[in-house]
UniProtKB/Swiss-Prot annotation:
Pathway linked to the protein: Amino-acid biosynthesis; L-lysine biosynthesis via DAP pathway; LL-2,6-diaminopimelate from (S)-tetrahydrodipicolinate (acetylase route): step 1/3
Domain of life: Bacteria
Gene symbol of the encoding locus: dapH
Annotated source species: Ligilactobacillus salivarius (strain UCC118) (Lactobacillus salivarius)
Protein family according to the UniProt entry: Belongs to the transferase hexapeptide repeat family. DapH subfamily.
GO biological process: diaminopimelate biosynthetic process; lysine biosynthetic process via diaminopimelate
Reaction(s) this enzyme catalyzes, per UniProt: (S)-2,3,4,5-tetrahydrodipicolinate + acetyl-CoA + H2O = L-2-acetamido-6-oxoheptanedioate + CoA
Protein name (record): 2,3,4,5-tetrahydropyridine-2,6-dicarboxylate N-acetyltransferase
SUPFAM superfamilies in the cross-refs: Trimeric LpxA-like enzymes
GO molecular function annotation: tetrahydrodipicolinate N-acetyltransferase activity
Keyword set, alphabetical order: Acyltransferase, Amino-acid biosynthesis, Diaminopimelate biosynthesis, Lysine biosynthesis, Repeat, Transferase
Length: 234
């Protein structure tokens, strides 16, 4: 997939047909319903389920042949679809929210509650832990660990901003924030809760708000920065 810049993403959202996807369980004389071809149905004579856009489904539900229905909906006028997770050779746990037009490398891991926005990239073997947020166009290299609750700032608006870049073999602790335009160098470690406002040199450890260098990675026990390959096996 070609890399998206901010203007590509803005154009995609602006020009997309906004949709309100719904799933409806319906009961009634279903054979009498006039259902347009763009609404997907699985009907028996008197019960069934429909999938479609609310603009197309709502008129059907007003038909007198419908006795009752139960509607499920999780978005309104959405501009970017959710990605087809089956296309990735990665481990993606239930509850991860991943929008379309992202890249996820082989053997990557995306944990429950993680949010991956349009244009983001995750390198092979990297883990995005629970509740982490990768904003639009955020780039994570190979064999990284992005800790639970961490935010890599998105850069769709303003469009001139440069994306966050996390180079290979980086470990970021829980609840850190990396601001737009920041590059975290190869093999670096970012402490939990840090707010990273400036580039981080390779193989250094930064902590605090704002994050500052406290030592080199060579001074840290290997057990505290180990990336476990077994967690990435499929």
């Amino acid at each position: 997939m070609a890399k998206l810049d901010a203007h590509d993403i803005i154009r995609t959202i602006a020009e997309s047909k906004k949709k309100t996807p719904v799933k409806v369980y319906v009961k009634g004389d279903l054979n009498s319903l006039d259902v347009p071809s763009n609404v997907e149905t699985y009907f028996t004579d008197n019960v069934g389920v429909m999938f479609g856009d609310w603009a197309d489904v709502e008129p059907i539900l007003k038909d007198s042949s419908v006795e009752s229905y139960h509607l499920e909906n999780d978005g309104r006028n959405t501009g970017v679809a959710m990605v087809d997770k089956k296309k990735f050779n990665a481990r993606i746990e239930p509850g991860a929210i991943i929008r379309d037009q992202v890249e996820i490398g082989d053997n990557a891991v995306v944990m429950m509650g993680a949010v991956i926005n349009i244009g983001a990239e995750i390198g092979e073997g990297s883990m995005i832990d629970m509740g982490a947020v990768l904003g639009g166009r955020a780039i994570v290299g190979k064999n990284c660990h992005i800790g639970a609750g961490t935010v890599l700032a998105g850069v769709v608006e303003p469009p001139s901003a440069q994306p966050v870049v996390i180079e290979d073999d980086v470990l970021i602790g829980a609840n850190a924030v990396v601001l737009e335009g920041v590059r975290v160098g190869k093999g670096a470690v970012v402490g939990a809760g840090a707010v990273v406002t400036k580039d981080v040199e390779p193989y250094t450890v930064v902590m605090g708000m704002p994050a500052k260098k406290v030592k080199d990675v060579s001074q840290v026990d290997d057990s505290k920065t180990e990336i476990v390959d077994d967690l990435r096996k499929l």
